Amino acid sequence: MPRSVRMIIILTILSLFYITLFVPLTPTVDENFFFSSDDPQLQSEILIDRLFVRKSSQLILSATGKIGDNQYQNKISEISKALAELDGIVSVNSLTSEGPGSLRSALNSPLWKRLIISNDRKSTNIILILEEEKSSEIVPKVETIMKSFQDKDFLLQAAGLPYVVELIKRNLLRDLRIFNLLAFLIFGFFIYQIFRSKSILAGTMIACLNACIWTFIITNLINIPMGILTANLGTIIFVMTLSHIIFLTFNWRAFREDTNCKDPIKDAIRRTFPPSFWSMLTTFLGFLSLLTVSAKPLRDLGVSGAIGSLVAIVVAYCVFPAFLKMVHPRPRKKSKIEHYEVKTYKAIDIGKQFIIIIIFVTCLLTLPGLTMLDSDPSLLSYFSPSGKIHQGLSYIDRNGGSSPLILVVRTKNGDKIHSDKSYKQLWALQESLEQHRAVGSVISLPVIIAQAIQQTPILGWIMPRHLLLEAMEMSINDKVAKSFITDDRKYGLFMLRMIESYRTLPRLDIVEEIRLITENEGFYLEIAGDIYILQGQLAKLVIKSLIGGLSKLILLFGIIAFIVSRSWRITLSVVVSIFVIPLTILGCFGIYRIPLDIISAPASNVAIAMGIDSMIHMIKAYRRTRNWQKVRDELWQPVLTSMFVIAIGFGIFLFSTFPPTQRFGGAILLGTVLAALTALYIMPLLSDKNRLGEWIGSLRVKINQLATKSF
């Protein structure tokens, strides 16, 4: 074993020890994973916290059963007591705990009928207020208690952001462990089957592993945690490294079979590195373009991906070649996979006209889907519709809403928010909001005051409203009024739970409708906050970054294609070919109404990066040979090998039980196949004026023949 290989193995072992001991590999997903504290979108949240006493970290448990039976109410009492004993739970509000005390009282209560009684009268809610910093620890304990109390007559279901966040984190962690490992093994299996060399297999696996490890070490050193998007970064970096290695190895193999070549490794590096460098540069700048987005997960992905693209090329050309030196020269026999690749390529090449037509027709058919993109999906879309989790979340959502929205209002005429006139307007606004189709429940100042009057009828009716509010601000009353009115009495707060199940409009459009309702009732909507609007803003940023990012990427690829090719026609053909990939992927998302969530949204960018890799290698080869057919004969195998390995590796993500992972894997699978076929056929066709004219002419002839036969 050469000394260089021994040093690489030792470095790999040390890197594994370091990442195991010092780098947290659990995805960090908390209730603030949408934005960082300095993002403009969170400034409204900070302002609301300054104005009001908030208890925003809530968990909602729905208990379905015969809600009027004593046995049901006894169970509610028992589970409420068990939950209240958990460390990290601030309060428990239920039918029997810090609530109305009985079903009749709840139904007659202005507050409790809105807060804990479901719309279908088949369940009641248990509202848990959590300590935010302990919410991730509390959720598993709450689930344990739910399991111990649940039976066929007492069905317990949960909702609320802390619960959803914990489930997303679990799914990401499971997929990180299972599917990334499976992808790693599948990549290795195919590399060995294609090249039939243990040295190449070992070099590929060690190089790709080091690329992932070193990227995570560097990102950890600059305080970028593994988050909701960077959880799949390991597979992306593995693929970027693997792509460089596949092209390098095929070139090395071609030079080794050339009797005039003295040093196949150096010659292979000399031929492969320039296109690899340009491919890396496009990917690097593409990831950097995400830094302009004010959504923390996308910025983290941008930095991590940019670092990963640099590490990938360094590892591919500094680590892997040492293992090529260990490969013993011997007669090479084609593996079964290579025979399959040859047959596949021949079949594709024979029917290339149909392949080109199918790609263009598919792109045109899916084009209307771009106007139907579901770019603002609900949190329900993160879970399988047939699963118990989705069904539970959906039930709670339909019966009172599940996504919180805070409205801070002030009067148009400058009156105090609790004046007689304003108080009547607050009730009118309360009732108008409750009539909105997207609003599940509303709690506001008039509801709280009405509840106080009901509980102390004599004092409540006699006592002036300002004194009643002062009493409700006392610690003995849990300072409840401070959550709904400011000290200067100028601002009032409405706490809404929004319904996601039936939503057809983007969240921000619904918030705009609510703003108009607020103004029609005599108030200005000063601030809108909480998860509902944050998700709406995130969705807007994702689609904006997707469109802007893709436009910048394609422009960037065009510039680099011109630098590499020195031809405007080839540059234009690259731009058109690259455009086909995201248009088809996103068009399919729209046509089939597949939710474009924050996890699956970057998939088209990743697929484009892979497509440009093959195209740049082909452009460099064309400058050398000046013949596209010779270029295909030389590069079809590394292009298709890369396509097969990557497509199968990401294809296993379709077997995940976590829909965002399925969508991410499926999008890259489709994009990888499109990228390879456009690189092999569409780009060369568009760049050759004569061939394009001949192809269009032959297509017209065939269309005329078909038209003649049909008549």
Mark where each language-model region is.
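Membrane-embedded transmembrane helical bundles of large multi-pass transporters/channels
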Residues: 1-29, 133-378, 519-711
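Juxtamembrane extramembrane loops of integral membrane proteins
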Residues: 28-87, 421-423
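Juxtamembrane segments of multi-pass membrane proteins
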Residues: 34, 40, 351-470
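Extracytoplasmic
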Residues: 42-43, 74-129, 137-141, 166-170, ...
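A short beta-strand structural signal in non-transmembrane regions
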Residues: 59-66, 112-147, 155-157, 405-410, ...
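Short amphipathic alpha-helices in soluble, non-transmembrane regions
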Residues: 74-83, 138-146, 421-433, 507-517
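Acidic-histidine catalytic/liganding microenvironments
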Residues: 83-89, 295, 399, 430-437, ...
